[in-house]
UniProtKB/Swiss-Prot annotation:
It holds the Pfam family Iron_traffic. One of its GO terms (biological process) is cellular response to oxidative stress. This is Probable Fe(2+)-trafficking protein. Could be a mediator in iron transactions between iron acquisition and iron-requiring processes, such as synthesis and/or repair of Fe-S clusters in biosynthetic enzymes. NCBIfam families: PRK05408.1. One of its GO terms (molecular function) is iron ion binding. It comes from Shewanella frigidimarina (strain NCIMB 400). One of its GO terms (cellular component) is cytosol. Belongs to the Fe(2+)-trafficking protein family. Keywords: Iron.
Amino acid sequence: MARTVHCQHLNKSADGLDFQLYPGELGKRIFDNIGKEAWGLWQKKQTMLINEKKLNMMNVDDRKFLEEQMTNFLFEGKDVEIEGYVPPAEDE
């Protein structure tokens, strides 16, 4: 049976993550308050950030920047801004 959480990002009940994917207190907060769907949305944004900003995960400053962006996206409702990216237009 899937674990259910009240996802803070989506503001609804959602399937919870299967295990803690991020270390420390922030990882516990994500595990307790973020659903699989929201985590998937973050992973897409994270990949775009790493690629477009050429982040190096061996660099402490780059990891700190990415963690700040993750917190802003998942818990504060701030979208990730990526220079030059224009979302595809929705067909009407």
